[in-house]
Amino acid sequence: MFLGTHSPRLDEKGRMFLPAKYRDELAGGLVVTKGQERCLYVFPIREFERITQVLRAAPVTAKAVRDYSRVFFASASNELPDRQGRVTIPANLRAYAGLNRDCVVIGANTRLEIWDAQTWADYEAEQEQVFAELAEEVLPGVL
């Protein structure tokens, strides 16, 4: 499970150090792809394969399934962390997420998300009130 917030930096080659506590889970490979709200999703290869199976079972006759699958898979990039724990973020994905030097990596249960630092700060500030309001709707009777 991926938890927490980290602030790695992109180097001039578009590489970033993955947080050390996640490296074992990602050592076998990972997939980086477009996420919602202009962030990037980082999946361990097994989780990406599970999602692939779910999408494979969805009806290709449904336009929404075709549209989502095209964007999701066309932007996906298989990556393997180097010996130092760095992963390269492809230029097209850096551009999509507006990534420059300062980034934020958040744990989001089964995936990591990579955000531009300012975009994340803005999103988090905007969502703080919504977070409080949605607790009962999202987790009824739990919290």
Curated annotation (Swiss-Prot):
Keyword DNA-binding (UniProt): yes
A GO BP annotation: negative regulation of DNA-templated transcription initiation
MF-aspect GO terms: DNA-binding transcription factor activity; transcription cis-regulatory region binding
Pfam families tied to this protein: MraZ
Main location: cytoplasm
SUPFAM superfamilies cross-referenced by the UniProt entry: AbrB/MazE/MraZ-like (SSF89447)
Record keywords, A-Z: Cytoplasm, DNA-binding, Repeat, Transcription, Transcription regulation
Location of the protein in the cell: Cytoplasm, Nucleoid
GO cellular component terms given for this protein: cytoplasm; nucleoid
Domain SpoVT-AbrB residue range list: 5-47, 76-119
HAMAP family linked: MraZ (MF_01008)
Assembly behavior: Forms oligomers.
Similarity section: Belongs to the MraZ family.
Name by which UniProt lists this protein: Transcriptional regulator MraZ
Native source species: Thermobifida fusca (strain YX)
